[in-house]
Amino acid sequence: MAIWRGSEPLILASQSRVRQLLLANAGLPFETMPAAIDERAVQRSSGLTTAGEIAVRLACEKAREVSSRSPGRYVIGADQTLECDGRLLNKPAGRADAGAHLRALSGRTHALHAGVAVVRDGRLMFENVSVARMTMRELSEDTIESYLDAAGDAASASVGAYQLEGLGIHLFSRIEGDHFTILGLPLLPLLAYLRSQWLLSL
């Protein structure tokens, strides 16, 4: 039985395979349409400084950009930022940068801020930011190099140089927070919003 009551599928303004998998596993029909925005430019021009504010602003801007090309559709935007000791880390540019990220996070607790937004016809309908706290174990240089060898290009594909759903799980001693937040899409508040709009039958 289909649980979606909308007349058309959702649009996910992201190419993230993990976010796509989360929506698909939740039984939500959707199409993907990547947002054409310069994330660094949005971050610089927004004047925002906290990781949570930046995550939700980027989520909103992604959804707005795609909404401008998708009249009448519910568009989901999502973004994730990482903060460690007051410093924001961006997605690593390559292996050397990923190694630097891991050295900075080694033995410390960092926060992942996941923002999600829903926009329809250019109007912000819903936004949420959730936080998870991640404690990385002390990593030796050998461990970092072994991880980078094993992870390959995946080490540069996310802001923390790890994917918790993959080899990244080996790097942590403690995790506090919602699983979906860690994966970059606060699914529970998103589903609650869709339910409040009578778009879900469950």
Curated annotation (Swiss-Prot):
One of its GO terms (cellular component) is cytoplasm. GO terms for biological process: nucleotide metabolic process. It is an enzyme of class 3 (hydrolase). Its cofactor is a divalent metal cation. The active site is at residue 79. It is found in: Cytoplasm. GO terms for molecular function: nucleoside triphosphate diphosphatase activity. It catalyses: a ribonucleoside 5'-triphosphate + H2O = a ribonucleoside 5'-phosphate + diphosphate + H(+); a 2'-deoxyribonucleoside 5'-triphosphate + H2O = a 2'-deoxyribonucleoside 5'-phosphate + diphosphate + H(+). The keyword Hydrolase applies. It comes from the Bacteria. InterPro entries: ITPase-like_fam (IPR029001), Maf-like (IPR003697). Keywords: Cytoplasm, Hydrolase, Nucleotide metabolism. Signal peptide: none annotated. Nucleoside triphosphate pyrophosphatase. May have a dual role in cell division arrest and in preventing the incorporation of modified nucleotides into cellular nucleic acids. Belongs to the Maf family. This is Nucleoside triphosphate pyrophosphatase.
